[in-house]
Regions:
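Soluble or luminal CAZymes and related metallo-dependent hydrolases
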Residues: 13, 48, 98, 172, ...
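Non-catalytic C-terminal accessory region of glycerolipid acyltransferases
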Residues: 135, 162, 174-293
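Short, flexible loop segments at the rims of nucleotide/cofactor-binding pockets, characterized by
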Residues: 92-98, 166-171, 209-210, 255
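Conserved beta-strand termini and adjacent loop/short-helix elements that scaffold enzyme active sites
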Residues: 101, 143-145, 170, 248-250, ...
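Catalytic core of membrane glycerolipid acyltransferases/transacylases, capturing the structured
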Residues: 65-66, 112-172, 197-202
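Proline-centered loop/turn at the N-terminus of a beta-strand
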Residues: 12, 115, 139, 166, ...
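Residue-level "edge-of-site" marker
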Residues: 35, 69-70, 146, 173, ...
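Membrane-anchoring hydrophobic helices of lipid-metabolizing enzymes
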Residues: 1-120, 164
């Protein structure tokens, strides 16, 4: 079973250093400093490096040298997503630009007044996507694991302020299910990842990059139960200061067979996820063995 534990990397001191650089010198100097941090993880974070290296080498077929280079790039891109999150959420002056392919699809979901489910994965920068979704003019709910260490979470909240979306935290008591149900019943948008699960969660299986992999059942159960429109959304970084947000055409799964709906949704999601992984291979932040059964 995949061994992801829902915890993120980093230390409070590291965040403080980068926030200080951002406030005093700007984004590009912070990116420069990030090179050394990325190299540290590249050299000394064996477990996550092995999983990511195997993804480049075994799944995408890259040579050893290219896989190592892509591994370093992956750490550097991941660090940039954390920096960009702080910049955008805290209002630090920046020169970020954005393209938004499929915005009309999300506006159509809002217009339908049926609620909607936006599914993504740990590819690109979901925080940037959440920032852009504000302009849809409707309530946005983001479902997430509470994976930050408490000290880091408190510090980041102090720097950025509270998120401009409603956060629904996944909890062991399943109270998040009721919060999601209420949001959809109120015709709101619910955003969640559909590529990771914790031990004990129910799963569905699909071929992904040539090998069978497991995906969390929860997001697909919700869509099958509430029969709300679905769009697959990703925010990808295309240059140092430019993001490209993709939102697929809305899907409405009306089949009365719940299992058939979940399988069709999963296949649609996997197609979108594979497309983004192949187009932006360095931006899949998957630091565990995704295919381990």
């Amino acid at each position: 079973m995949p061994s992801w534990q829902g915890k993120s990397k980093g230390t409070p001191l590291g965040y403080r250093i980068f926030v200080s650089v951002l406030k005093n010198f700007g984004v590009m100097p912070a990116y420069f400093l990030l090179r050394f941090v990325a190299f540290h993880y590249f050299m000394f974070s064996y477990k996550s490096s092995k999983s990511t290296y195997d993804y480049f080498h075994k799944k995408l077929g890259y040579s050893t040298i290219r896989s190592l280079f892509k591994l370093y790039q992956n750490y550097h891109f991941f660090g940039q997503t954390l920096i960009d999150k702080v910049v955008v959420m805290s209002g630090i002056r920046n020169r970020f630009t954005f393209d938004f392919d499929g915005e009309e699809n999300l506006r159509k979901i809002v217009t339908l007044q049926k609620g909607g489910l936006l599914l993504s994965s740990h590819i690109g920068n979901w925080e940037i996507a959440g920032h852009l979704l504000k302009r849809l003019g409707t309530r946005i709910n983001v479902v997430m694991f509470d994976g930050e260490h408490q000290q880091i979470k408190e510090y980041i909240t102090g720097v950025t302020g509270e998120r401009n979306v409603n956060v629904i935290v996944i909890k062991n008591d399943l109270s998040h299910i009721y919060a999601i149900s209420e949001a959809l019943a109120n015709n709101e948008l619910v955003c969640m990842h559909a590529d990771r699960f914790l031990e004990g969660n129910k799963t569905l299986s699909s071929n992904f990059l040539g090998t069978e992999a497991k995906f969390p059942m929860g997001p697909f159960v919700l869509a099958a139960k509430f029969k709300v429109p679905v769009s697959y959304v990703f925010a990808m970084k295309e240059s140092s200061l430019h993001y490209h947000l993709f939102a697929s055409e809305l899907k409405e799964y009306t089949n009365t067979d719940k299992n058939a709906v979940m399988q069709q949704m999963l296949q649609d999601f996997v197609v979108e996820m594979e497309d983004k992984v192949k187009r932006y291979p360095e931006q899949w932040y998957n630091y565990y063995n995704f295919w381990q059964q």
